[in-house]
Amino acid sequence: MAAPAPAPRILVLLLLLLPAPEGAQSELCMISHGRKVDPWVCPDFCCGNCNDQYCCSDVLKQVMWIEEDCHAPEASILTDDFDSGFDSDPVARFGTVIAIGVTLFVIAVVTVIVCCTCSCCCLYKMCRRPQPVVTTTMATTVTHTPYLQPPSYPGPTYQGYHSVVPQPGMPTAPYPTQPTGPPAYHETMAGGAALPYPASQPPYNPAYMEPPKAVP
């Protein structure tokens, strides 16, 4: 019995390897919706121009893609896609702002550190400039406060003592506050016994006259 001929298998393989007709090829069209240009896969042809394309099956209206003329829509597609994604995601926008702020802060800190350590920087010269020494003289002023004497008040008077007007020719009695003189010579004699002080002779009174003595 003869083996079957492999003609059907070879025919199927050839059909798969043959290129598809023009109308069966899918093309990437640039469909414009306002400012945004979206890529769209057309099963037939892309008709129109580089900026605004649509799907059609007419070969005469097919747009001829030229790299020099149709390069701008691709750039606009990427730009518009990036802008739309950035605007629609507030978290990404906030993260971008934080990243920019942190970067600027780090750059500022590094700049200050470099300027403070480098001798050719103006900030280093400003920080290392010697400060002028200011000498201050302190003067001490002494003020003399006048001594205030306590006010003198009259002392209490002795109620039992009355001043007596001295009589002419009579000795004045010593005041109690006057110190007494040294003791008389006859008071300090041998034996230590003090003699009584004789009474003083009364002063002479011209009005008093002795009676005349009788003559024998």
From Swiss-Prot:
Keywords: Apoptosis, Endoplasmic reticulum, Membrane, Nucleus, Signal, Transmembrane, Transmembrane helix. It comes from Bos taurus (Bovine). InterPro entries: Shisa (IPR026910), Shisa_N (IPR053891). It is a single-pass type I membrane protein. Residues 27-93 are extracellular. One of its GO terms (cellular component) is endoplasmic reticulum. This is Protein shisa-5. It holds the Pfam family Shisa_N. GO terms for biological process: apoptotic process. Can induce apoptosis in a caspase-dependent manner and plays a role in p53/TP53-dependent apoptosis. Belongs to the shisa family. The proline-rich region is required for endoplasmic reticulum localization. The keyword Nucleotide-binding does not apply. Interacts with PDCD6; PDCD6 can stabilize SHISA5. Its main location: endoplasmic reticulum. Residues 115-216 are cytoplasmic. The chain crosses the membrane at residues 94-114. Residues 1-26 form the signal peptide. It is found in: Endoplasmic reticulum membrane; Nucleus membrane.
